[in-house]
């Protein structure tokens, strides 16, 4: 790559000349950084039956800290904490779930990767983010139906949710919310023991004041 400099003469004449690289030094920032991350994790829950979507009682908490002591430039630091709480619903196999998360980044210009869950349907850019997610989950049917040797349909579930989020950046603070419904099914493919959850989520979010729809996909890899 060649560097050029622009010179302006008195008579509004402009000309461009090539720069001799021997007299200039160009420093490009590294695209890869070495980070150190520390964390704590705690979980406690009741044993689940095959028909339950979530544990009747459960608590999961995590917290962490990330910084860059090995870099020659100061990338700042990040800390976060979040937790899940599960409670019994109004009837058998129903479940109420609560989630709360908070993260803070010291550098207001450069963001680390996100560590907490956003409100559904919303993206929260900023150096300080808070999130609250609530959901009520219920099974609709238990078909236990093998559709072929490749697919086994286990359960069909539904959920309603309401989420809230707050984001602070260099321009100020903003809060948003979303609400909607989810429809999912728990399946097994190729006779594998690991359950796969497929579904769709639709709702309304106040960030852009419009409806949204997401696909849901998760794999249970518990040992």
Regions of interest found by a model, annotated:
Residues 94, 98-108, 188-223:
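Predominantly the C-terminal beta-signal and adjacent terminal strand-loop region
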Residues 10, 18-156, 160, 168-169:
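C-terminal outer-membrane beta-barrel translocator/porin domains of Gram-negative envelope proteins
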């Amino acid at each position: 790559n060649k560097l050029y400099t622009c010179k302006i003469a008195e008579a509004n004449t402009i000309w461009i000349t090539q720069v001799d690289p021997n007299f200039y030094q160009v420093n490009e920032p590294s695209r890869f950084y070495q980070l150190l991350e520390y964390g704590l994790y705690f979980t406690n829950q009741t044993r689940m039956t095959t028909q339950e979507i979530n544990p009747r009682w459960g608590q999961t908490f995590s917290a962490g800290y990330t910084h860059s002591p090995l870099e020659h430039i100061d990338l700042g630091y990040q800390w976060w904490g979040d937790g899940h709480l599960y409670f019994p619903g109004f009837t058998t196999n129903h479940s109420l779930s609560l989630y709360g998360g908070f993260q803070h980044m010291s550098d207001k210009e450069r963001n680390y990767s996100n560590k907490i869950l956003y409100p559904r349907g919303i993206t929260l850019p900023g150096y300080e983010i808070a999130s609250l997610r609530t959901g009520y989950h219920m099974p609709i049917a238990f078909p236990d139906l093998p559709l072929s040797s490749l697919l086994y349909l286990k359960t069909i579930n539904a959920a309603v949710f309401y989420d809230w989020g707050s984001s602070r950046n260099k321009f100020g603070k903003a809060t948003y919310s979303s609400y909607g419904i989810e429809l999912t099914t728990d399946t097994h493919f190729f006779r594998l023991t690991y359950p796969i959850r497929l579904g769709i989520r639709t709702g309304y979010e106040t960030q852009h004041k419009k409806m949204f729809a997401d696909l849901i996909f998760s794999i249970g890899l518990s040992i």
